[in-house]
């Protein structure tokens, strides 16, 4: 029996509101990497054909499995809080993955669609968009649990030297085992941004929770350092000043633009509501004139 099977993902469709949350999260800090999980659904289509061939008393069964078309649709993301902030590494704890699975189940009940954790994303500040060897091995570990699991990378704070113009690059990948080797290598997956006219409730909540998550990370780091017994008073005062400076920077870089964006969207929604109410009145007048 000969079986041919395609196990990888052929394409990823990322909705624009989820893309916006990922981008805002990646741009929230340029000193450390950030991370999150992607919630969505998998469309897996395929068919199998079986044919029986007889040759005398012998029977040969040939089963052919058509290549399955696996498409990942990402509808929302969950921003994860970092327990250890490092410049070139991010880690997702089993507790965070379990909590994300519970959130996906809750969304599945609300939407009536088979929502699940379909991937993860993280940022690459000031470095290339391509995954590192650690990223490729981490992705391979996730694919051992789910073959359709994908990884997204957002490379930000990249400046074109001649023009001084900043760029943001993004990519989607999976890990495949290299031929004649035990190592893994990246397989780039085509990613498409799906436009949306409105921002979903889940993505809006994630965007609003971002400042609080960043503040919790700073508080945990400060408490961990402040709890050391061998620090003198001057060092503690300095650490407190650094903590205050980081919070003020977050308010300026994250909270302020987020508040302005929400106010702008509220104004747009109010204008749209007035337009719809006026259109309703015009239609009602036209309907009454026909009677």
Swiss-Prot record:
Entry-linked InterPro entries: BRCC36_C, JAMM/MPN+_dom, JAMM_MPN+_peptidase_M67A, MPN, MPN_BRCC36
Domain of life: Eukaryota
Record EC number: 3.4.19.-
Top EC class for this record: hydrolase
Motif JAMM motif mapped to chain: 122-135
GO biological process, one term: response to ionizing radiation
Binding site for Zn(2+): 122, 124, 135
Segments forming domain MPN: 12-179
Molecular-function annotations in GO: cysteine-type deubiquitinase activity; metal ion binding; metal-dependent deubiquitinase activity; metallopeptidase activity; polyubiquitin modification-dependent protein binding
Record GO cellular component, one term: BRCA1-A complex
Coiled coil start-end: 259-286
One Pfam entry name: JAB
UniProt KW keywords: Coiled coil, Hydrolase, Metal-binding, Metalloprotease, Protease, Ubl conjugation pathway, Zinc
UniProt record similarity statement: Belongs to the peptidase M67A family. BRCC36 subfamily.
Its biological purpose: Metalloprotease that specifically cleaves 'Lys-63'-linked polyubiquitin chains.
Name the UniProt record assigns to this protein: Lys-63-specific deubiquitinase BRCC36-like
Species: Mus musculus
